[in-house]
């Protein structure tokens, strides 16, 4: 039996986090949920996720700064990172892309099924 793919869900809004957590768990993923950038960096090393679903606007350390640190840390530099954010301006997308994000999804422009499909795509799974 193949082990579950591990997703690190980084979202400071607890309602949004619980919705994404529940749906991804239903899809068969093993989920670890954290609520700020500091927790995200620690969990990325401890949990060893297959993919990080990362909010941009968070307390303590922004998602952009988390992404920058992940990409400059040997143990995490190759992790797949999908940014899921309310920030819809091109400058924000370009900033994330310059930092090495694998995908950038704007919350107001996607439904949860789209998020699941993008996660599966980046993990090489059938959609």
Identify the function of each model-found stretch.
Residues 55, 85:
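Active-site residues of response regulator receiver
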Residues 11:
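Conserved acidic carboxylate
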Residues 59, 77, 89:
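The feature encodes the CheY-like receiver
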Residues 1-6, 113-127:
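Non-catalytic signal-transmission and effector/linker regions of two-component phosphorelay proteins
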Residues 33-51:
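Acidic, metal-coordinating helix/loop segments flanking the phosphotransfer/catalytic sites
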Residues 14-32:
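Two-component/phosphorelay signaling modules centered on CheY-like receiver
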